[in-house]
Amino acid sequence: MRRCIVILVALLIGATAYAGGGVPGVRTEWGVVAGVHHPLAKFNMGSSTAELKANTGFAAGLHMGLRIVGILGIQPEIIYSYNKIALKDEKQKFNTEIKCNTLQVPLLVSLKAGLVRFNVGPVFTLMDNPTYLDRKGEKVMFGRLYPTVSYSAGVSVSLLRRLLIDARVGGGFKAVENCLSYDIAAEGEYIKTTMFNAQLKVGILF
């Protein structure tokens, strides 16, 4: 699945570059974006006594756009995001931070109305490997936060054809399973996570 996504992204980048060569009625744009990534997580802890709190992080990446007759657009992106989840278990006397590194490829359809663009589409997760350290300092895999395919929707504004301001929300269609283990040699506890996020990014278009 992930190999197919990589091939799809490569084809989209190639199509964008080709369209930039002079296809009538089609305009391309490239840019870089960066900003705030705020996770909105719902944790179903089951029998676990732990408490989890997702903290705000950052997001940055590459923005591409294929604008058709100035109104409709196809907008593939490559976005990396990073944030931490605070893990606290008073009963087990254990505290740590789960470090979340995520690489996603939104493939959005964009509709322009004046200065505003309305964007919606699927998001493909290529990398999602949250980890934390157990009592002995060993790295433990928490398990992925997003399913392979999730969604994103939002609005963006392009000013002076160079400055892009983008706000969006996104998340998974279903919960994923994660594992809490304070000792890598012991069996862990399983919880369910439904992950959403909100992002506010500013970009420069070329």
Question: For the regions a protein language model found, what residue spans apply to each?
Answer:
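Flexible, solvent-exposed loop segments that connect beta-strands
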Residues: 40-52, 82-101, 128-147, 175-193
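Transmembrane beta-barrel strands of outer-membrane/channel proteins
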Residues: 32-38, 76-80, 120-124, 153, ...
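Residue-level signature of outer-membrane beta-barrel architecture
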Residues: 64-66, 109-113, 157-159, 204
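Residues that define the transmembrane beta-barrel architecture of outer-membrane proteins
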Residues: 26-28, 52-58, 99-103, 114, ...
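Outer-membrane beta-barrel "beta-signal"
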Residues: 33, 157, 161, 192-206
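Outer-membrane beta-barrel biogenesis signature
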Residues: 5-8, 12-33, 206
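Membrane-embedded beta-strands of outer-membrane beta-barrel proteins
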Residues: 60-62, 105-107, 151-153, 167, ...
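Repeated loop/turn-to-beta-strand initiation elements of outer-membrane beta-barrel proteins
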Residues: 71-74, 115-118, 161-165
